[in-house]
Amino acid sequence: MNINKIALIYNHNSKHLAIIEEIKQLYNYCKIEEAEVIIVIGGDGELLHNIHRYMHLNIPFYGVNLGSLGFLMNPLDTKKLLQNIHESTVSILNPLLMQVEDTSGQIYTALAINEVSIFRKTNQAAKFRIEVNGIERMSELVADGALVATPAGSSAYNLSASGPILPLESNMLCLTPICSFRPRRWHGALLLSSATIKFEILNTNKRPVNATADFQEFNNITNVTVKSTKDKPVKLLFNKNHTLEDRIIKEQFGG
């Protein structure tokens, strides 16, 4: 990948400003709108926020990890930064499109790179009905919540909720309950990425529920519809010896 114009994004309150200044001195940068690659320095959260902010530009993102986990990031190598970008591999992520309706009848939409999650708002467990492609698959799930994860997001919140990790090219989605009470033995489902999943919230007055698409939260919802969309693909760049697919495989073996 031959790259000449790069943009740099970082948190100006970062505790790593000395390292960031070193990177700034080594390379020339342009405005984000003129860039061929957007470099995001920080952690997964910083990268996700900026993907949501700039994904409409259809410019590849290259993350440099100065956070803790950095699953979607590349290791820091200031001297070889440009070389690593030139030699990088591209992973295409298709986000989830979430549509929610709240108790006032307002309808909202949002995109998620990792997952869409719904969860109880009070100490009362949530109750909801689940449809897949217009067919009722579960008349009542009683749980703290549930989530739908992409392959890229399957190793994040989904894994913590005991969901499976999906290979990046699997064209699948994870539907995973969060602390399921009834049915107690239900551990979720693997669905084709073409599936449309709908959650209808039951007893919303007594058991209010919120929904999130990555970090965007919506309160007091009555139903949620989730599906994958190929209309807004996100390109992530990874070092050739540190690909996202390799990391997903490694995570499955306790790496």
Swiss-Prot record:
Subcellular location: Cytoplasm
InterPro entries cross-referenced by the UniProt entry: ATP-NAD_kinase_N, ATP-NAD_kinase_PpnK-typ_C, NAD/diacylglycerol_kinase_sf, NADK
Keywords attached to this entry: ATP-binding, Cytoplasm, Kinase, NAD, NADP, Nucleotide-binding, Transferase
Active site: D44
Top-level enzyme category: transferase
Record keyword Nucleotide-binding present: yes
Main location: cytoplasm
Molecular-function GO term, any one: NAD+ kinase activity
Source taxon at top rank: Bacteria
Assigned GO CC terms: cytoplasm
Catalysed reactions, semicolon-separated: NAD(+) + ATP = ADP + NADP(+) + H(+)
Role noted for this protein: Involved in the regulation of the intracellular balance of NAD and NADP, and is a key enzyme in the biosynthesis of NADP. Catalyzes specifically the phosphorylation on 2'-hydroxyl of the adenosine moiety of NAD to yield NADP.
Family assignment from sequence similarity: Belongs to the NAD kinase family.
Name recorded for this polypeptide: NAD kinase
The species this protein was found in: Rickettsia africae (strain ESF-5)
The organism's taxonomic lineage, starting at the top: Bacteria, Pseudomonadati, Pseudomonadota, Alphaproteobacteria, Rickettsiales
